[in-house]
Amino acid sequence: NLIFIDASNCINRMRGKIRTSNEWPMVAFVRLYLTELLPNDIEKILYMDCDTIICDDICDLWNEDITEYNVAGVLDCMDDNYKEKIGLGIGHPYINSGVLLFNLNKLRDINIEKEFVDLVNKRGSCFKYPDQDVINVVMRDSIKVLPMKYNVVSQCLGFKYEEYVIYRNSSNYY
């Protein structure tokens, strides 16, 4: 089912809790409040950015077993220096937040919204992608990495396979 949710009350409450720059609108943080916005009987949710193009059946994605994870997503290319800067650490995956499968039961158990707010207010000024960075840092020990087919980002399409392997294995992109 496709459900539209009015998040205006949530956004108004966030304004008093989250300090953010004008560069990122408050609405970017709404997905951090999914457990508050959605009824308790919803156990899992598939989040997709509005610019996502679906080319095939997504049932396999929906049926991914995430019972032991907070979130599932596809790896994003992020250099190790940036991962360390945001407090993630080199050994942890960094996933793209454009397509995410959230385990709402696990997130409710750990009061995830408070962790999100605390991190944004403490370290948010060093984040390039605040909502994506927060998801990666807070959930770093409970991320399931999904196959790339579930979220192919455009920079992957401009490379030959050999070039992409070099790009992915680089420790310095600049």
List the predicted regions and their residue ranges.
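Active-site-proximal specificity loops/subdomain of glycosyltransferases
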Residues: 2-37
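Short, surface-exposed amphipathic charged segments that create phosphate/polyanion-binding patches used
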Residues: 14-25, 86-90, 160-166
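Active-site phosphate/pyrophosphate- and oxyanion-stabilizing loops and adjacent acidic/basic residues
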Residues: 32-36, 59, 133
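Conserved PLP-enzyme active-site core in the AAT-like
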Residues: 42
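Short aromatic/hydrophobic "clamp" motif used to bind/position activated sugar donors
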Residues: 45
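Catalytic metal- and UDP-sugar-binding loop of GT-A-like glycosyltransferases, i.e.
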Residues: 48
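Conserved donor-nucleotide/metal-binding helix-loop-beta segment in metal-dependent transferases, i.e.
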Residues: 52-85
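Catalytic core and acceptor-binding pocket of nucleotide-sugar-dependent glycosyltransferases
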Residues: 72-79, 92-174
